[in-house]
Amino acid sequence: PTWLETADKIALIDALSLTGVARIEVSSFVSPKSIPMLRDAAAVFAGITRQCGVIYTALVPNRRGAENALAAGADEINMVMSASETHNKANMRMSCAESLAGFEQIMQAAEGTGGIINGSIATSFGCPFEGGQPAARILGIVHRYMDLGVDGISLADTTGMANPKQVAALVGDVLQLIGPDALTLHFHNTRGMGLANVLAAYQAGARRFDAALGGLGGCPFAPGATGNICTEDLVNMLEEMGIPTNVDLAALIEVSRTLPKLLGHDIPGQLVKAGRNSDRHMLPAS
């Protein structure tokens, strides 16, 4: 993966902050031994220019990460575990039970800080090591998060194994337990079904979705996992369907256009390449 300089990360986040997106995950407070390119998380938080109305979040694996994130000024922390025992041990270096015990410590650390706490469930729609995860297991973790008192829950399709029928069923089940404002869906486009899954989730009642600028991303502990759904492609789809997003799509596209030069390679997103439906082109010379 390409190593972005701290100043470049800050510039990207500052540009994104002006596009109307509601939340930006700034960085992750993980061990620099595990993911060295995230060792500047605190410096990135310190360097960004915050915009009113934007929530700046951080991913945390444990109490130390949560304390560091809150000290750095994260408005929201996202604690994560896998539904799959095997993936959790590969990704988090602990069992699912140990992760849940650690989350109790995170809740204690966050008490009184005013920080928003989100609980994420990785491999909610399938694991590359174990295969499909029973809905009952996902719902059991949702209940555990609710018992802990989290503010929101995310269902993550970490390896892009979800399909629209499966998504609609699980989202419907989870929305029997929590409201749509407390549920986020996190899809990867590994098998080309990312936006189809968004539509299925939306039709089932979900209203919050994670996405990555340019369709970047992945998971170092998931074989073959590619990027998240592309932010500008997602916004474009919703806007074309008449669903308002409050995001300035033109500004978002301009930010995405800076990525290939920064990264030194092309990006998966399609809208930047194809243009919007409203764009008009000259006829080729005969």
Placement of each model-derived feature along the sequence:
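Catalytic cores and adjacent flexible loops of soluble metabolic enzymes
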Residues: 1-286
